[in-house]
């Protein structure tokens, strides 16, 4: 780095003395073109484009007929008139002899020969004239020659010529320039050859300068402003500014400094230094990059200008104390006059400083005119510099976003390798921020096995007992350090050094200054940007300085946090490559890297935890598979048992019941179904494997009240009956029959006695695992688990294609038992049936048919005989009531009616609704298509009548359930016949008109004074008037229910007295002229002792009295 004070003034190229006057003294060529000094470097300017287009035009014409230089000049004049702007390096036509704008035809017809043309050029021009005349006489032949016989090279050049005829636009932020920046290195901008190479333009530089010197001051000023107005390459722009300022002020050389740093630590960086009008852009950029000059604000001439924002004009540099003559002494160049001026943006902030040295026109100092021109031109240059910086920032931001996107992609690509991920992040950070070293410290996160076991044995809803690593306000620094200990260190050195991973010891961490700084950041959670490490360590007594910081100048250290804002590591950058401190922009970029590093570390740890959990799951599945599989003794016993015929189990009948079958008989019945369908031999199922699988399936059903193994057996038997008796096997393949029977047996595996809604409400693991058809998906997974268990795969002999097919059938069939799926598929099935569909072999139609068959089998208990059906219904209701109790207890919510134990009397009514909504429509449409399963439909109709009759009796006030559980059928209530009912007072009301007429004379009354419940209709009502138990009232209701059926009462009610209350008669006025519409009211009281009248009523009299009332 060049000394700061030496950079304040002076020059470095003795060979490039003030010699531009020699070139300026040469005579100017007449008609020098108006052009910009951009020809010093071939950038994206009109000058370069015009030069290239002129060459393209000349090449295109020459390829056709050997065009001369005169044609090229005429074409250039045509371009100039079209674009209305100067083009270099061709001189314009003298003003005294204006030439009209040539047309394309005139180029070929022109035969004039201007002075200076050679004889060969004259001959070429004659050839052009001859060809032009031929083209004019026979244009069709020329067109045909172009389209059929013209060489491809000629056509290509001609196309380029035509394209070049279009007017040029002013240069802007073209895609080429943007792509040039995109392909540049993140740390060192790689300039394109067009920007850095000015070899082609250097040869035309004297002509450009001579042309510009021929302009008046106003035209020159505007031309130079146009030259820099749209330039976005900061290096090219600065070079243009210095060259143009030299032309405007006749300065020998100049330097341009750009302001950098934070608001509290600003400095100047020499973008280009000692640039003369002959200095090539590439040389200037190379020299500035090789020896970067940094000048703090307030130091030297340029530093003072930046500090004060005031211009400095020095007439004799050696007499000014701020001037440093060391560079002059090294180079032999003598600095006389210096003019240094600030460059500000639109807000008035310093963005740079421009400095010019020595006059070349014989003057010894810069006068006021030079100062004014310099100030005016730098005003416009400030706008251009800020635009170029904004563009550079946008490009850098784009590069940064691309790097961050790559890092995001790397997080998922390297999630199984933390070392590779962190190394990649550090490499990207080092290259983008241009630093020497990069380190990442990882904090111990208590991932040891002991803490894991502590976590497992923690009780639910209990505070965490493990020591926390949270930093408390009252903790000392040492206590905070003890809570954050680094366990892994990633280090990345220079560009050619490989990354290293180590596990530092406590001694190494306590003796390393860099580690202590990282420990400080992890403890405080603050970002540290250290410009001077030695000074920072002196200010923090708790950190000890070691010898390793001798080579460390600047450090940027930042915490890495996870989603819970807990520090999991520290990222550290050491020393910028150019020796300057880290800026706020660097900290902002590094923050993004720290965030991605935290995401990567967190994601990797999550991935490792997931892998561990998967391993634990495999172990658990192995254990579960072992315990879920039937024992070898049970398998051997079932294998040796004799299997009865299907008729002995009544498997062909739709009235099958399992009540009389023992558990072993249920397994034998399943085996008989497989044997009867010829599945064992058809698919080569080993008999012992089939027996073990059946026993394992039975073992994996929970002992719930309804959805247990026997329910699965009934569903499978109904499917067997539909296939055999219902003759539906003709629509199925053997593989589909196998899948359907397996699905029926497994469709409720591991049922917990609760439905999908309960799983969702309680947010159970099953609901998290399966968002739709929760239990059905679990049943299928259990089915797969059993099949995958050793010795249970009954599909082992199937081909891969058949295996996939049968598993698809099993999955679809089990999921179809979800009534939500039934309602989705029902309309499509009904539409097919209504359209007279008879071909069910299509994949979608077969899936619909199997789904409807599964639902029909699942609810087939509704079609069983009444003595079976009402028992099963009570089991279902009891299971539902248990779920309702759980909802009240766990969720503190009121369950729906069918699960509310308090509304159990509504069960008959709900059964009727279930039959009407689901069962009857399904069986009706199936019977229409497959008439052999009509018994299912007829049985459902019969049970509906029974449930409807029971529902009507419940509406009359009869209670059909007399206790909390409903495992007893209605008929079993007869066992209470010998019990005596005591202390019952009830009222019986009837609207029998004949009886009303008979008793009206004695108890007649006005209808308006009759209670409404006595006028509401012919019904029997029970009303509790004392401390009467619920069981007693239920028994009485049952007795009356039997009496209403005409059967003999089974309970001997000892009615001791029947009388009419005198109080009621007194309060009910009667009128002989009006009929008694309210009915007769009788109050009867039963007591164990004799009544007040001493009259005892026996059972037969009681029955006669009730019958007469009813």
Swiss-Prot record:
Catalytically driven reaction(s): 3',5'-cyclic GMP + H2O = GMP + H(+)
Lipidation (S-farnesyl cysteine): 1107
Residues that hold a divalent metal cation 1 according to the record: 711, 747-748, 858
Record-level GO cellular component terms: membrane; plasma membrane
The UniProt record lists the keyword Lipoprotein: yes
GO molecular function list: 3',5'-cyclic-GMP phosphodiesterase activity; metal ion binding
Membrane topology term: Lipid-anchor
Prosegment residue ranges: 1108-1110
Positions carrying Cysteine methyl ester: 1107
Basic residues composition bias: residue spans: 1100-1110
Compartment(s) of residence: Cell membrane
Co-factor binding details: Binds 2 divalent metal cations per subunit. Site 1 may preferentially bind zinc ions, while site 2 has a preference for magnesium and/or manganese ions.
Compositionally biased residues, Low complexity: 1-25, 35-55, 192-203, 1082-1097
Domain annotation PDEase: ranges: 631-954
Cross-referenced PANTHER family: CYCLIC NUCLEOTIDE PHOSPHODIESTERASE
Oligomer status and interactors: Interacts with PrBP.
Role according to the record: Has a role regulating cGMP transport in Malpighian tubule principal cells.
Protein's name in the database: cGMP-specific 3',5'-cyclic phosphodiesterase
Primary gene name: Pde6
